[in-house]
């Protein structure tokens, strides 16, 4: 009664917003948030068509709509959504080996831009999986090109991305960078970190960084894909012993577990509904 109408409304809007181009359906106009690129005539732009982030979000939206329809036994718009989903632009790899940010392989004006929008499908989305070796390598190149500096929330997002890429040590490095103490109150695109009161500094304060920091820690301890739960997927060396309780997993599962010397010694999963999950460790 609440969630489905929101999803359906978004689906209806984007079915009408997408336009055909070269055999695909793309968003137009489209941006990769706040980033700019250089066109073939050396002019600088931010608006184009078919950005990777747009396509990633729509793949997720349409996929979620189809799953919701199956659960609710609804057939409305299913054929249209399935057809549109098949025509959405696939991920593309650019000439530098990076996951492309736009439909065309434009060079970004700022290679170290704080946004990593083209990697939405890796995180927080769940479109690029551990079996997708070529795409994972392209994501790694794109993330490496961005660098490890940035605003407070940016470092949290990068930590989440490195965790998804299987690099716990790099993720931990980003978290430590984010814990850099700053007292800067004016708006700045560099020198991000954490204020003495533990609030994230863009600067100024942005709650994204605090939530993102916690999300990155959880990504390093537990990851999910379909009906699989991966325990300690990218545990950094400094965290060889630990305990976590009350972790909420997809499907309404509550997880508690303890590990020592990188080995799980206790584990409990609770759910209010019956379900089958594959536990990997």
Q: What are the language-model segments listed below?
A:
Residues 1, 13, 17, 57-72, ...:
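Well-ordered alpha-helical scaffold segments within catalytic/enzyme domains
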Residues 6-21, 85-96, 138-148, 175-186:
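Long, well-ordered core segments of solenoidal/helical folds
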Residues 3-15, 154, 171, 194, ...:
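Extended, hydrophobic alpha-helical segments in both membrane/secreted and soluble proteins
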Residues 169-281:
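Non-catalytic C-terminal accessory modules of carbohydrate-active enzymes
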Residues 1, 5, 15-80, 265:
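The feature captures the catalytic groove of carbohydrate-active enzymes
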Residues 78-119:
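Long, low-complexity segments enriched in small/aliphatic residues
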Residues 24-51, 99-111, 165-166, 200-208, ...:
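Carbohydrate-binding/catalytic loop surfaces
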Residues 110-186, 203-219:
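C-terminal substrate/ligand-recognition segments
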